[in-house]
Design a protein with these regions (language model features):
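Charged, solvent-exposed interaction patches on well-folded alpha/beta domains
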Residues: 1-3, 10-18, 24-224
Length: 224
C-alpha cells in the first residue's frame, strides 16, 4: 500500500468532503500504520424538486433532491443504503416549493432569505408544541416575505420569516381552541401579530370511513 507518512491528510479530507452527503471529515494518522477517519453525514430535513444539469449532455433533467439544514442539495440515496426506519423518515419529509428558476447542483447550497427561513421553520417545527399533532407537507415560498405551510391535515398556515417559536405557540393555542369547539383550522395567518385571521374547515356530514393511501414518491430521475 501507499506509504502512510507520504499521504496528504488534508487532501484526503478535502476529497471526502466533496461528497454531497458528507458534512465533515476528520483524518488522523496513527503510527506505525493506521489511518483513522471520522465522518459526519448531512441530515436531510426537506425535499425540493428542481432541474439538475445533465452530465455530459446538453439540457437539464427534473430531479427530487434532499436538503439539509443549511440548504445543501443531495440526491436520494440508493434504497440498499437506507434502513427501513430511515427510509420511512425520508418519505415523510416536507417539500419546499415556489422557488423560481430552480436549477440545483448536487452538493451546492440553495440560498435565499426565504429558503434559509423555510429550513429553520422545518427544524423548529420538530421541537414545537405542534410536533406530533400535524404533519408538514409543503412549505411554499412563492409569496414574498412569508412562508405558506400546508399540512397533511389540510391546514394552510402563513408564517412570517422569523419568530417561529412565538408563531408555533400561537398556532397551538388556536389548534386547541378549534379542538374544544369540534372544528379544524382551514387557514391561519400568523405573519400578523394582532387579530390573527383564521378560517375553519367546512363541516362535512359523517360518512363511512374508507382507507386512503398516500402514493409513494418515486425518486428516480425524470427526463424532460
Amino acid at each position: 500500500g501507499e506509504n502512510l507518512l507520504a499521504l496528504d491528510l488534508a487532501q484526503v479530507q478535502r476529497d471526502l468532503e466533496l461528497q454531497p452527503w458528507i458534512e465533515h471529515v476528520a483524518v488522523e494518522r496513527l503510527l506505525p500504520g493506521t489511518l483513522r477517519i471520522r465522518v459526519s453525514e448531512r441530515k436531510p430535513i426537506a425535499r425540493i424538486v428542481g432541474f439538475e444539469p445533465s452530465g455530459g449532455k446538453a439540457g437539464f433533467h427534473l430531479t427530487t433532491f434532499f436538503l439539509d439544514r443549511e440548504g445543501h442539495a443531495m440526491l436520494p440515496p440508493k434504497n440498499s443504503h437506507v434502513s427501513a426506519p430511515e427510509g420511512a423518515r425520508l418519505d415523510r419529509l416536507p417539500y419546499v416549493s415556489g422557488v423560481s428558476g430552480t436549477e440545483i447542483r448536487t452538493g451546492r447550497r440553495v440560498k435565499s432569505l426565504q429558503m434559509d427561513s423555510a429550513l429553520q421553520l422545518v427544524e423548529e417545527f420538530a421541537r414545537s408544541p405542534m410536533s406530533g399533532l400535524v404533519d408538514l407537507d409543503v412549505v411554499d415560498l412563492s409569496l414574498p416575505g412569508v412562508l405558506v405551510v400546508k399540512t397533511r391535515q389540510k391546514n394552510e398556515i402563513t408564517f412570517a420569516l422569523d419568530g417561529f417559536d412565538r408563531q408555533m405557540r400561537h398556532w397551538r393555542l388556536i389548534h386547541d381552541l378549534a379542538l374544544r369547539e369540534g372544528r379544524q383550522v382551514a387557514t391561519l395567518d400568523l405573519s400578523v401579530s394582532n387579530n390573527v385571521p383564521a378560517r375553519w374547515q367546512e363541516q362535512e356530514p359523517e360518512r363511512p370511513s374508507a382507507a386512503v393511501s398516500r402514493p409513494a414518491v418515486d425518486y428516480r430521475r425524470k427526463h424532460v
